[in-house]
Amino acid sequence: MIYLVSNQKSLFETDAYKELSLSDAIDMIMPHSWIEYDSETAGLDPYTKPLLCTQYGLGEDQIVIDNVTIPIEKLRCVLEDPTKTFLGWNIAFDLRFLYHHRIVPYNVWDGMIAEKILYLGYPPQFHSLALKAAADFYLGIDIDKTVRGQIITQGLTIPVVQYAAGDVMYLTKIKEKQDAELEKKELTKAAEFEMKFTPVIAYMEYCGAKLDPIKWKQKMSRDKEEVNKAEAALNKWVEDYYEEHKSSTEGYIRVSTEEVPIMEEFKLFDSLNNNMSNVKRVQNPQTGLIHYEYDKAFPYVTRNLQGDLFSGFDTCAKCNVNWSSSQQVVPLFEMLGLNCTTIDPKTKVKKKSADIKLIKPQANKCTIVPLYVEYKKAKILVDTFGQKFIDKINPVSGRIHPDYFQLGADTGRLSATNPSLMNLPHDPFTRSCFIADSGYKWISCDYKGQESFLMASIANDVAMLDELVNGSGDLHSLTARIVFTDIPDDTPLSEVKAKYKPLRDAAKGYEFCFNYGGDWNTLMKNYGLTKRRAQEVYDNYMSGFSGLKRYQEFRREDVLDKGYILLNPITKHKAFIYDWDNLCKIDNELGSPEAKYMLGSNGDNYYKTSSQHLRRRLSDSMKQSINYPIQHAGSMCFKLSAIKFFNWLRKNDLLFTVRYCVPVHDEHNVEAPENIAEEVGKILVKCMESGGEPFCTRAHLGADISIEDYWVH
């Protein structure tokens, strides 16, 4: 039975539900410890849009309370009852509207988060997290969502009341099905842990962060200047290249082929094409080798021979490349000898690209590469971190309120959109644009070398642990001494940074590469090393960090044995290989006599394509099996410490006084009144250190703190 509590008499001109008083509604709700909960709002923002109604599912009965005429504060006795758990779907959204009325439930259960835990590792297109999809998947019920689009424009109407009640009819039944799957997959503890974090992430979204728009505009101007400088440097390089290589024909450059012996001249000649002009055969008088010189079109510069009234005459060749256009950049780069062919990560098909990840390792081929890298870095800052941040400042709160998702990656890490404050540039000026309110202090607290400590602890690598616990903690110097034979073994690590800085800087990249499953082949691709040198560096690294080597070997075997990545042994979070059954099927097929025959034949066929797909997918999964547990442990440290801090704020009646501004993977940023900032900072450090203990068991994971008027870290 559906009941409505409202002072709007027009809403009772139907027999679809019954009228109920607020006191009777509370009497019906109070005996229940698990309550299905949902809300309808006039928009997505609790600061500018009102709460229209809240719904309470009680098994066979659903109660809809009109919060336009019945203040939500009158439900505080229900919503803040610590004996009750509120079961919702994407309940963090509903919590933000409750927080706006300073109502903070103690216990929640989010069916959407439970569903994500069950299918962590699956791409979005493989399994929907929508309530409608879950009702169909688990119960075979089609929930009609057509009314939802009318709520913002029409408000609370009779159809909306019926629709609202429908959203709290099936949550318990879905949860029962989910619970069975969670138990089957040993994920119950993982779900229980994540549910404790859901109120915290809703609080982060509600609090937001304050941006100084004047200083941000200064940052935007600086970023634009850097783009202009980088673009000018690229243009000058192209113009200088043209002047150095230009032929007697305007718009052409003079190009030489490689030198070859006379016996191979016919091959060289055949490689020339009809588009080449003014071809000249040249023989080296000393070696006898042959090469050809010819004119080649160079459409990347133009020359203005007419001038105009305003700019006068400048007959110098000017670069006309749009450096933001891959279609224009790729032909130029290929002409300069750069490889612009890569594999599309989604389609797995070859494509042309001027992506910085592809171009940067080829710096040894052409001096334009470093200039292009600087341009792309500067352009990203302008395109990504510009006016849209100012546009996102809430007109009521005066703050930016991103959308966070607590399982935003297969590792369990948070992600953010609209906009993301988690991947802001680390330069001090950008960070300092985020400020504390007047009378408040900005508290930044981040883990000291979190990934290094977690890597060493989880891998149980003696060399790493010894340096982190008993030494200076400088793993970069230790890595440099291990992989580079130029550094004597008896060199104190304290001297490596000063005496061998270039090698230490290079070691940072190698360290990151190997720690997360890369090998010598990855080193060749990303850093442009020769095969021999890359293999030498890799072998030295794995010999020096034997514990890490054993850990990686175990992880590779374990994922192939289970079909999923065990992210941590405490809560048993798992990242599933979404197509594991299909990969096993392919593996079985490839063992057949027919497959073995076809794999040895010429040309492409089904079995060869399947074999390539299998190798690629298994390779990806093995690399992830090394990377994921480390990143996951970091996210668990962060979440557990945030839960502890949130609970302390609640216990000490400091919620909405101390604001949670920006969560970063290894860093907490909060705002506190000046008179309690020191105390809050000390508590935050304690929460972070205790939050790291269960996941970094072989070394102490400490935290650094700064208390300023703005974001420092």
Give names to the regions the model predicted.
Residues 1-20, 39-40, 172-429, 439-441, ...:
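Conserved "right-hand" nucleotidyltransferase catalytic core of DNA-directed polymerases
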Residues 2-17, 45, 49-183, 191-201, ...:
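Active-site-proximal helix-loop-helix substrate-binding element of RNase H-like nuclease domains
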Residues 19-33, 77-80, 426-441, 650, ...:
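A short acidic-Thr-Gly-centered motif at the start of a beta-strand
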Residues 34-47, 447-454:
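Short acidic, Gly/Ser-rich segments with clustered Asp/Glu that frequently serve as metal-coordination loops
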Residues 55-60, 64, 403-494:
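Function-dense linear segments that define catalytic or interfacial modules
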Residues 318, 388-395, 434, 444, ...:
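Short, contiguous acidic/charged loop-to-helix segments that flank catalytic cores in large enzymes
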